Each structure stands twice: as C-alpha cells, then as structure tokens.
Amino acid sequence: EELNAIRDDKKEIESRFFAPLEFGTAGLRGEMALGCRRMNIHVIRHATQAFAEVIKAEGESACARGIAICFDCRVNSERFAHEAASVMAANGIHVRIFDALRPTPELSFAVKHYGTTAGLNITASHNPKEYNGYKVYWSDGAQLPPQHAAAIARNMERLDIFNDIQRMDFDDAVRQGLVEFMGAETDEAFLSNVLRQPIDPDVVRRVADRFKIVYTPFHGAGYRLVPEILRRLGYKHIICEPEQMKIDGDFPTVKNPNPEYKEGFTLAIELAKQNDVDLIIGTDPDSDRTGIVLKDKSGEYVTLSGNQVGVLLTDYIITAKKLTNTMPAHPAVLKSIVTTEMARAAAEKNGVECFDTFTGFKFLAEKIKQFEQDGSHEYIFAFEESYGYLCGDYARDKDAVTASMLIAEMAAYYRTQGKTLYDAMEEMYEKYGCYCEQTISIVMPGVSGLQRMKELMQELRDKPLTQIGTHKIDYTRDYMPGTRTCMADGKSEPMELKGQNVMYYELEGGTTFIIRPSGTEPKVKVYIMAKGANKAEAEAKVDVLAAAAKEIVK
C-alpha cells in the first residue's frame, strides 16, 4: 500500500531507491519508510546481518561475548531492536537487550560492564520524529572504529537484502537463552558509576532544602534515571514536566525534540514560573544531550548554548578538583574542532591542557583511549558544542545523566556563593574573554542535495577563498589531506588531524569559519566562532560572517 501510493511520484521513488543508506562510522540514520534509502525492518535486518559477519570474523569467543542492544522512545525503535536481536541470535551471537528504552550512555556502559564484543542502539537521537537510526559500538564502549564500519558497508554491498539474511523468532531466541534481558541490575550498576563522578557533593547538601530544578526528558529515555540521579545526589525538589514525562515517539508537545531549541522548553518554563525555579534541565530522546534554561538578571528565562554550558562545566570541574585536591598530575580537557575556543582559554589559564578532535564523540573517545594507553594525560572533561558532555571512565559516549548531575552540582556550588549559573556565565566572559558562536545548517535534501554538497566542498578546494565577508583569511586548514596553508605566502604545513571533509578558515582578529557536511543528516553545517573586546563586538563579527555564509553555501 505504501509503495502503491507513490508509484506515480518519480521524485519520491528516486529519493527512496536511488542508492542504499550509506553505512558510516555513525551507522545509519534516515526517515522511516519503505525503500533501501529509508529506515525499515528490511534495512535493519540487512545492516544487522552485515554487522553479524564482522563479529563472527572475530571468532567463537567474540560471538559468545555477544552484543548489547538498546533502543529509544521512537516509533518502531523497540521493533527494530527486536529484529536486530533476532538476526544476531540466528547467527549464533549472544544478545543482551534492554527490557525497555534506556539512555544511550547506558548502552556504552553495558558494553564495557558485561564485556560484550559490540553494541547496537536503535535511535535517531534529537532528529525529528520521522527519523530513526542504527548506531553501532565496539568492545571499548565507543562508536565503531572506521575499519569495522567499512567492513559492514562492504558486507551490505555483498549481501542480498532479502535472500542472505539469517533470522529467527525473537520469543524463540529468548526461550532458548540466545537473547537475555538487561534491566534493574544494569541500571543500578550504571547509576553507581555515575554517582562516582560528582566532585564536591557537599555543596548540594547545603542548598538541597530550598533549591528547585525542573526537568524534562522530551518524551524520551531520560525520564527515569535523570530524576533518580538528581535525588541520589541529594536534591529534594525535582519537578518533572508531566506531559513530557510521557514516553511518546511522536513528540506531541514539541516541533523538534532537541534541547538546543528554546521552543521545546515551553511547558517546562511555564512550570518553572509557577514554582519560582532558577534551573531547567532537558535531555533529548535518547538522553545523551543536555540543554539548560536559566533565569537572567531581569527574571526572563534564557537558554544557554552547548558551548556556554561546556565552558561553565570546564571551569567548574577544574575549580572543584583544585578545591578538593583531586586534580590528576597531567589533566586534559577535550573538545571538537568546531567547539568554542573559550574552553581552551578556560583550561589553559588554569594550567590544564586542551586537545582538539574531529566532530563526533567517537573521536573524543579515541583520544580518551589514547591517554589511557600512553599515560600521557588523564582527561577530566570532554564535550562538544552540540550539547554532549562526558567525564569518568565508565562509558565512551556523551551522557546526559552524568551531565545533568554535574550541572546540578555546579548550580549548587554557585548558589552557596549567592550566585546563579547566569551570573557565573557573565563571570566567564570577564575571566576568559568575550566569545560568540553560531552554527548555521543549510538543508540539501535528495539526490541533488548530495551532489551539491560534494560540489560545494570541491569548489572550496579548487577555488580557495581569500576572504569571508569583510574578514581576510590568514590560514586555511583542509582536514582531508591534513594541511594548514598560509594565505600570505602559500606555504603549507602538515597537521596531526586529517581524513575528514572539513574546511577551516582562520580569519584576522582570531575569528574562525568552518564548513563541513553533516555526518547524519542531508545538510551542510557552518560554524562561526568569534572573539571581541566585548560581547557586542563578538556578536557583530558573527553577524557579518553569518550573512557571508549564506552566500558561500547555496
């Protein structure tokens, strides 16, 4: 019926069938519908058979250690997870699957905790309701390394989507012990690890009687564990937004279930006003990203960006570790190349090194693993501008459960000093300088969109920009070959990071302009990062470059 409805729509047919969804290091993500370029049970089975071949190639013990499977609140997520389990079990791979939706970081934890060979999460994170995804992990709890992702992609090309799939009935697999459920016991193990991350929980006890927090899970997986961890931290007044505590993959109360947008917090803000609350915390549907809303000096509720929250946490974690004498000998803060340079200023001014990685938490996880292996540094905090934060060694993906807890601890610390988090953010600008950032997403859907993205990135290499808006370019970094070129003399030098389709422009006056195609959606992203003598100057620089971005990316 679904395909019959589009039989006369050539553009829709082409969009759904012109090529399969590409399996990348982030797995698969797409709109739910029939077609090889959409998310549906056939694509799930196909990807899972290809994944199973990679696990089987590791040997019998890898199959016995098996795979941990998780899913979020989205329409079809549980069904897709059970389908994946059925294919894995039929391939002789032991499956541990959660008995209901869980936060993404708990899957990363479960892989490490149970020593499984791999992990799989059915989620589209903060994307609109039409989307679902297939996110893959390896034995270290981090997202799949490139060589394994490439092997899965090759297997998908080789295997027929219908005839080469091994699967069995899910209930039969459970009865035979090939599939076992994870539940409360795993939750407790996860929460006990999260509870090791607070730096100075005493500050919470000092304010717990009067400090109120409003929480919303955006209809998703944080609904149980985030309020629970805040209570265990010592908070007594956690007010959960009742409508958004209802699990619903249609996200009926928001246009977009993304804590980046203030619109999603409308109900939570109303609740906060009724209860005179200073802090609102929101987590996305798979509970790996965290957004906050604060009262400003005039009593208005305002959102903070992922960059701002990351800087606040960087500064707080360093301050608290120094106060409690828990700072390691060689501490490091990690961030992605598109994340604010204010974090570097906050780290380095306090004697902590700051390292950059490519965009995506898998790259931050690789750096954490490198530090563990070579002993050169111990990371104390890792974050991205896209609202993802992590500390500790229990997981290898961004964690909204721990982030919510640390934000709440930080808020308590400032309350003991008679300050709000808004006051603290104002102090950050005084301490580290006035930074301003903006991310612009330009959607390029369908076949023509993919082609345009390729053409755009090639044009930027073939005809190098010399200025953007009114700003002259000092250096151009091309992260594909890993070269940094001085525009004055044309000389290039190699960079440590390479192999990603990113163009990075260092402009006069310390401003940055970055262009990259999204790894998960049909869009090009432009990141603008500016520093000024004051906030107005920094914002003006961003405005000029934002206007220029729309001319460059069209």
Could you tell me what each predicted segment is?
Residues E1-A84, A173-V174, V179-R210, A221:
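An N-terminal, well-structured beta->alpha segment
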Residues E12-L21, N132-T266, A272:
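Gly/Ser/Thr-enriched, mixed-charge loops and adjacent short helices
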Residues A68-Y131, K236-G291:
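N-terminal small/polar loop signature for handling phosphorylated ligands or for N-terminal nucleophile
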Residues F80-M88, Y131-W138, D288-N307, A343:
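Short Gly/Thr/Asp-enriched flexible loops that form oxyanion-binding sites at enzyme active sites
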Residues Y137-R167, N307-H330, K335-A345, A400, ...:
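Glycine-rich phosphate-binding loop plus the immediately following alpha-helix
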Residues K273, V277-L279, E300-V302, A320-R516, ...:
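Phosphate-binding and adjacent anionic-ligand microenvironments
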